[in-house]
């Protein structure tokens, strides 16, 4: 694109035929985050990068994008040694990154967001008409349909992601790093994204695709590199990969990916919502006349794009948000707006979405967190006054062993545990109460594939015991794997409910966007 007086100047440079990272080492205090990792990307390919939390994926890509600097090793672009000092440096070398959590300003338009941080040949004046025209040109080339004049807050999640891609392309990115790009997309939006990625690859771009969804990796990538404990396990052509093989490479042992559920033996209703309404944190409608029944011995999955009332639903049931209309009953008793302690006393357990905020107290020990809400129970106290710490530690040690929680001791502060082990601790605590009703909100978000496997097994075991489980998840694969019934939420309402028996994924995706 020629640079005229009225244009913003894109900073990207020429095509990247090859990018190679060799012997990359990165140390943090007490941690070897990257241990002589080799990784390369070629023009025209989609290279998937897999690994559990802490495997080194983020560290490696942050070094490629200039956020970290390697202690040892070399980066070469088109066979020329290259030092990337900052994200600006990375952009100038033709490297763009699409973060999992979009870096957009909601109140600004598409064109204004794309122009942020760019240099103008007119000093402080930005000719947004020129930016908009270039955005439309790129949109046509790569089928990234978006109106440059719309504010970001009016766009769907999939459209916001297109803006992120457009911004990188506008800056001249020849290589794109995509971090968990499908995490919050509907099935239809995933299909649209994959068409865009394939077109970018066909046009000569190199793409790094970071994901934990193995079936998507197999569908979209040409090669796969797996990291474990800061080291590269292997790089193989995707044509030679299978889901079990990739999972075993990630974890170091065989992983159960498919679950054989026992036949449904549903019992009486344990939880019922009748026309429940509630306000969101912004004072707008969060829930709109939601009705739902949950029976003992079944898992009901709540599917939907994030922000469509799932959080409000969980909080209304668990006494953390006021129900403004309608009723909530547990085992036939009206518990509408009952306090959490009262709900806990009648057998309702809750695995919260934000485990570090609502699930644990970071400065408390593992043992102290294990007995949260139960610290006054007769089995842990004398006359409900003096706590029996030996009994608390004994119970906690049994839970650590049963739930395979990795911790140095019961006295270790929770803040030092990994996300997966914190989630196992919350799960152990909630299930130790033998609940009649379990609300599980995003139970595997941000945890490793090994911990995910364990949590899924525990939920299915709890189902078979007769517990009524409400599973709220943004991961449609998780919903489909565990649920007996699936209800879809959109704009605070339940817009559809299906029995999970060869469910039509496309139909679910349509419901998630408000279709019928």
Each language-model region and where it sits:
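Glycine-rich phosphate-binding loops of nucleotide-dependent enzymes
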Residues: 2-516
